[in-house]
């Protein structure tokens, strides 16, 4: 089978699927993407140039859509080059989030297209307005509604959609759901598995050495910000550290993946400042973002893993924490409840 994948950050959500297809040694796999250093043997990467950013004259509510249509054009141009070289895929699989798939049915009409549908945005009842501490201004609502422009374009294509959880499917309008299949994202259980040996010896994480008698509490997010409950976790530190054997590692950058940054500082610094100058942070480690092996070792050694999120897309780290056997404390939100059953696995 000739598989064509499309994702601006190769391999994106398709890592395990692509590896599985490569291991079958029976398929031709091409991947259109922005240039990056990621590599999977047996996959032919075809790069496209990142489109220039939207002009300042573009209305602020639709700049994201403007960028998406530029990506759609760039990917379609790349696809036409492949077609001129005689390439014809049997199926196209990609992520709709950045608009890259929107013009591909024009290049290869009749070729099945399976698009990853991640989230349909709402101005109420989901992530927006969930946290009373950080209320959205009504002026944000036009921008939030406009974020669905790519979703709505994608739903008009002669194509089918996939989404990884029942909750994510529920964010889409009822009329759209019959065209979207829930395909759960797996975890590589050969890699993400318990490692009891790590509890019997000291484990080094950066400059830290965690001993067998230490109780390790872990938290992981791409960035330490309210969407992923960083404020709740940081404010809980004084309570956690009342036990002298507890050590806490909070993995995540100081950037912003969702929402906006606080003015003149980072969310981490802002919330840590709330604890006061007298707070002893010697048993709290903020390593920033870490490599995958360090992250996996943390999960395997963790005594308690905390996963907090607004009603938004559940992170891969939640799945992987469960796979490694972590005792998970999760936020009581619908995306988490799909993975964590109270009293059974968290």
Question: What spans do the regions from the language model cover?
Answer:
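Acceptor-binding helix/loop patch of EC 2.4 sugar-transfer enzymes
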Residues: 52-62, 110-149, 190-202, 211-212, ...
